[in-house]
Amino acid sequence: MHLFRVTAITDEVFQAFQRLIPQLTSNVPPPTRADLEALVAFEGSILLAASLVDGSPIIGVATLSLVRAPTGVHGRLEDVIVDESVRGQGVGAALTEDVIRLAREMGANYLALTSNPRREAANRLYQRLGFKRWETNVYRFDL
């Protein structure tokens, strides 16, 4: 498995998101090229991608978002998406473990995530990797 940090939005990266986002959610459209370029330029985010071997098509992605707050650096694991054709083959685990490594290297004191309860395999993966249920309310304010 080849994991890499996305630093430029190539046609391959753009097309991967057009294919992968609908596999995650139907609530939002796939990002535009400008959205993805803003993501990789944003200082607080790291976009990772996975392919089976270097140069082969992208089969998974994950985003690490970091915020610096008075209580320290906090990490969030966002939008882990593995292509349906390769689920269950360790791609999600590899991406998540790499995000954990990067969060540690960046000085984060924790890494949080949310996962839809219907995504049973993903929830089992996160628990197997050591994520614990965080007893708090999560609120969202749509802007």
Q: Which stretches of residues belong to each language-model region?
A:
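Conserved acetyl-CoA-binding loop of GNAT-fold acetyltransferases
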Residues: 117, 127-135
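Short coil/turn motifs at secondary-structure junctions
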Residues: 67-69, 85, 118
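Acetyl-CoA-dependent GNAT
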Residues: 3-72, 78, 96-98, 133, ...
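Conserved beta-strand-loop-alpha-helix junction that forms the acyl-donor binding cleft
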Residues: 87, 112-122, 140-143
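Conserved acetyl-CoA-binding loop-helix of GNAT-fold acetyltransferases
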Residues: 82, 88-101, 124, 128
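Hydrophobic adenine-recognition pocket in adenosine-nucleotide-binding enzymes
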Residues: 80-82, 115
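Conserved GNAT acetyl-CoA-binding A-motif
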Residues: 96, 103-115
